[in-house]
Amino acid sequence: MKHLLSIADLDRESAVELLDEAERFEQALLGREVRKLPTLRGRTVMTVFFENSTRTRVSFEVAGKWMSADVINVSASSSSVSKGESLRDTAMTLRAAGADALIVRHPASGAAHQIAKWTGAADDGGPAVINAGDGTHEHPTQALLDALTLRQRLGDIEGKRIAIVGDILHSRVARSNALLLSMLGAEVVLVAPPTLLPVGAHTWPVTVSHSLDAELPGLDAVLMLRVQAERMNGGFFPSQREYSINYGLSEKRLAMLADHAVVLHPGPMLRGMEIASAVADSSKTAVLQQVTNGVHMRMAVLFRLLVGSEDGAL
């Protein structure tokens, strides 16, 4: 695997191997006074973010540093992009500067794929490119860390019924999760108002529902999504209050879930809209576990791309 641009870059076997690898990194760090492994010593990892981020950016930085990589942050606002430099010139500059990996977030769908083409194949001296979110397209490492969290909470993903709820239309997280979770054997249901479902949702390996209340009792897990108002130009629902009434995860709705069920959210959470504050802080909700798993999962991805599965121990 040269890049991780989409869940389509993985098959079931390689996805499970990444989940297992992430757990091995977690175990390798346990009990260490200094959380450092020599795995990526001498490698240069660059995070290139053209959109704001807390969880994804920080976890990639921590992952790289815990593996002894040299991590360099490139912010669009402080780079030559702000002076009008093209994305291609920026990407080629970072390659020439010695990047072994480029971790890219960009508001345009397909940006990471394009950067991978421009900078060349990883086995021909070009950097490995990791898609950290491209527009409304995909966010593969988020789906992987969500799958890891579900596996830890539920024991297995095979045969589980998992709902993805909310703004599916604008969500790269929904797309990647739908593909990965179904690949791992889950039954995935999208729950959203018709206006927040993409036109091609019927082609995804999912079922579709417009009623959250009808789905909750039969779920093993629910992934709540933020309404991405920054990507909306029109009225997709009458009001925030009505949206919350119909699709928000309230304490009453939380009680409708099975005892073993788990609640996920990729963040940032809009407390009081898609998720009640009490629900966000409940023991059923695995938001902070997702963040922790995000570091280990991204360590596994960096290891797989820059070292490979056969080149030695952690």
Curated annotation (Swiss-Prot):
Query: Pathway, per Swiss-Prot/TrEMBL?
Result: Pyrimidine metabolism; UMP biosynthesis via de novo pathway; (S)-dihydroorotate from bicarbonate: step 2/3
Identify the EC number(s): 2.1.3.2
InterPro entries per record: Asp/Orn_carbamoyltranf_P-bd, Asp/Orn_carbamoylTrfase, Asp/Orn_carbamoylTrfase_sf, Asp_carbamoyltransf, Asp_carbamoyltransf_Asp/Orn-bd
**Functional summary from the UniProt entry:** Catalyzes the condensation of carbamoyl phosphate and aspartate to form carbamoyl aspartate and inorganic phosphate, the committed step in the de novo pyrimidine nucleotide biosynthesis pathway.
Q: Which GO terms describe its biological process?
A: 'de novo' pyrimidine nucleobase biosynthetic process; 'de novo' UMP biosynthetic process; amino acid metabolic process
Gene Ontology terms: cellular component: cytosol
What assembly does the database describe for this protein? Heterododecamer (2C3:3R2) of six catalytic PyrB chains organized as two trimers (C3), and six regulatory PyrI chains organized as three dimers (R2).
Question: Keyword Amino-acid biosynthesis, does the record have it?
Answer: no
Q: Which reaction does it catalyse?
A: carbamoyl phosphate + L-aspartate = N-carbamoyl-L-aspartate + phosphate + H(+)
Q: Which UniProt keywords apply?
A: Pyrimidine biosynthesis, Transferase
Gene3D superfamilies linked:
Aspartate/ornithine carbamoyltransferase
- Tell me the protein's name: Aspartate carbamoyltransferase catalytic subunit
A Pfam family: OTCace
Its Gene Ontology molecular function terms? amino acid binding; aspartate carbamoyltransferase activity
What family is it from? Belongs to the aspartate/ornithine carbamoyltransferase superfamily. ATCase family.
Residues at which carbamoyl phosphate binds: 55-56, 105, 139, 142, 267-268
The residues the record assigns to binding L-aspartate are 83, 172, 226
